[in-house]
């Protein structure tokens, strides 16, 4: 399970990470936290789990190189980038990641309703491009397990799929795992819970039950 830590307070972020680290495989940070705390929070959170920088990098190749260099220099283990900018922009991100021996996840389709408007028609082409380019993985929506299943058929077992949208957006961990995702991404259902630790524990138990075939 990946924790989407979309809070805007450094102390809160570190407290939640400390509370839930035993139940998560990675922590995903994005603009809400980075813009208020700076890139330095990445190394602090890395004390608890590997950090994925969710910047959805989407620019020309040179700018992508500059962004990814800063992300990995700050201590991130992976970066999330957009695929719709094309192969040369993606190659630039993978080039920098390889220099740091880090990973790139490519967004194939986002989890909100609008993700089906423009990204969904291109998602399968993006998945094929990510595979050919040598990306580490793809982002596919937990809110639409059938789409995860479709993407998995395209890439086989060659790429890792991570799926946002579990919990507050309506996705169910067991459903999307059954569809072929490797890691679910959970945010508000954990960090807005009265007890983030207990919320993380419950979701982790649901995931383990699905993996054992109990659902």
From Swiss-Prot:
Q: Which reactions are catalysed by this chain?
A: orotidine 5'-phosphate + H(+) = UMP + CO2
Q: Give the EC number(s) listed in the UniProt record.
A: 4.1.1.23
Sequence intervals crossing the membrane: none
Binding residue positions for substrate: 6, 28, 54-63, 111, 164-174, 187-188
Keyword Lyase (UniProt): yes
Which Gene Ontology BP annotations are present?
'de novo' pyrimidine nucleobase biosynthetic process; 'de novo' UMP biosynthetic process
Q: Which GO terms describe its molecular function?
A: orotidine-5'-phosphate decarboxylase activity
The protein's matches in InterPro entries, at most eight in alphabetical order, are given as: Aldolase_TIM, OMPdecase, OMPdecase_arc, OMPdecase_AS, OMPdeCOase_dom, RibuloseP-bd_barrel
Looking up Gene3D superfamilies in the UniProt record yields: Aldolase class I
Q: Which Pfam families match?
A: OMPdecase (PF00215)
Family, as annotated: Belongs to the OMP decarboxylase family. Type 1 subfamily.
| Its job | Catalyzes the decarboxylation of orotidine 5'-monophosphate (OMP) to uridine 5'-monophosphate (UMP).
Full protein name: Orotidine 5'-phosphate decarboxylase
The lineage is: Archaea, Methanobacteriati, Methanobacteriota, Stenosarchaea group, Methanomicrobia
